[in-house]
Design a protein with these regions (language model features):
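Cytosolic-side transmembrane-helix boundaries in multi-pass membrane proteins
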Residues: 1-22, 292-339
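C-terminal ends of transmembrane helices
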Residues: 7, 55-67, 103-114, 196-204, ...
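Loop-to-transmembrane alpha-helix initiation sites
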Residues: 117-121, 249-257, 278, 296-309
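Long hydrophobic alpha-helical segments that form multi-pass transmembrane helix bundles
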Residues: 115-195
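Structural signature of hydrophobic alpha-helical transmembrane segments
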Residues: 39-51, 89-98, 181-191, 243-257
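N-terminal signal-anchor module of multipass membrane proteins
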Residues: 1-61, 333-339
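Cytoplasmic-side transmembrane-helix entry/capping segments in multi-pass membrane proteins
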Residues: 68-78, 95-100, 115-125, 209-217, ...
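Hydrophobic, membrane-inserted alpha-helices
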Residues: 26-33, 53, 57, 75-84, ...
Length: 339
């Protein structure tokens, strides 16, 4: 492996390695919630995902003739995120393929640490969702007893997405929504825990709030002004205020929206790097996400939206840099001309 690239990756690891360490450990509370809802199977799935991601890291180190270091937890954090985006009933081979796709195709193919243009966790999830939709986008109800190894006989459904897509309103009380007591990916329903994790990442200066806030605000505004619920779009704004707000609640708390806003959107190497760029980046992901949710076939369309906007995040950065230089060059040129 090129020595200059190795040194650059070591510098990047010193710069952003703490982000992945924090994400790794903050996935643990969500895993605990998943175990509370579904028993020991989420622990088994996350353990297998971690082992797969770590073995990929060691294999790539061997192939590239470099020393493996346990300071880099990016593979492990991507693996945990992929596992938490899965239903607790997913077959083990599907999860393993998703982790392999995310780590090897989403990350290592592009050069490894810090060189990838697409979020590796979103890549892994997208590959699994497209290849095995019946496994990835159908979920068991919380508190359903799950066998440890083979959960193929457990009843699963896509009730949440079916209800929203047909123009209905979720029959869930507020406490059930914020605690995640509904059929969803095993680590994405507990809104209170996810928000607490986001607060920790923000206080540790691992993430910037601009991208996440603009993403959630954009999704909320679209859900409020263009609701999917039957009859709301044709009614006046004030006469349907409460149903519209409930629709916003339902949209933001399902489909792994909050989870992705905290754990995927601010990934250091795929998010825009400047303040205005991050706001635009989050808004674009929000627009694309609602487009996928309204017109697509996957409840977790946010992962596909993220991949789509990842393709232009570098362009957003370059455009902002050019505008910044242009706006600061014009006053200096005028000043020089006046002198």
């Amino acid at each position: 492996m090129d020595e200059a690239l190795i040194q650059e990756q070591e510098r990047q690891l010193q710069k952003t390695g703490r982000y992945y360490r924090h994400v790794f450990w903050l996935c643990v509370p969500l895993l605990c919630m998943a175990c509370y809802f579904y028993g020991a199977r989420p622990l088994l799935l996350c353990g297998i995902a971690l082992l797969t991601g770590n073995l990929c890291d060691r294999l790539v180190a061997l192939l590239r003739h470099r020393v493996y270091t346990n300071k880099d937890l990016s593979n492990e954090s991507f693996s945990l995120i992929i596992a938490l985006l899965m239903p607790a009933t997913v077959d083990i081979y599907v999860l393993v393929v998703a982790v392999l796709a995310g780590v090897l195709i989403g990350k290592e193919v592009f050069g490894g640490y810090g060189s990838y243009p697409f979020n590796p966790a979103a890549v892994g999830y997208a590959v699994a969702a497209v290849s095995w939709p019946e496994q990835v986008v159908r979920y068991p109800q919380p508190y359903t007893p799950l066998p440890l190894w083979d959960a193929s006989a457990v009843p699963v459904s896509s009730t949440i997405e079916d209800t929203l897509r047909s123009g209905g309103i979720l029959n869930l009380n507020a406490l059930a929504v914020v605690l995640g007591e509904f059929a969803a990916p095993m680590g994405t329903g507990a809104a209170l825990v996810i928000l607490a994790c986001g607060l920790v990442l923000w206080t540790q200066k691992d993430v910037h709030i601009g991208a996440s806030a603009s993403f959630l605000i954009t999704c909320g505004l679209i859900a409020f002004f263009f609701p999917r619920q039957v009859g709301l779009a044709d009614s006046t704004l004030f006469s349907s205020l409460m149903p519209r707000l409930q629709g916003v609640r339902d949209e933001l708390h399902t489909g792994a929206m909050l989870f992705c806003a905290v754990f995927l959107l601010n990934e250091p190497y795929t998010c825009a790097h400047h303040r205005l760029g991050r706001i635009l980046y989050g808004a674009l992901v929000g627009i694309a996400t609602m487009g996928f949710r309204y017109f697509g076939v996957y409840e977790t369309g946010v992962c596909f939206a993220l991949l789509a906007v990842n393709s232009v995040s570098a362009l957003i950065d370059r455009t902002e840099e050019r505008l910044y230089r242009l706006l600061h060059r014009l006053p200096s040129e005028r000043k020089e001309a006046a002198e």
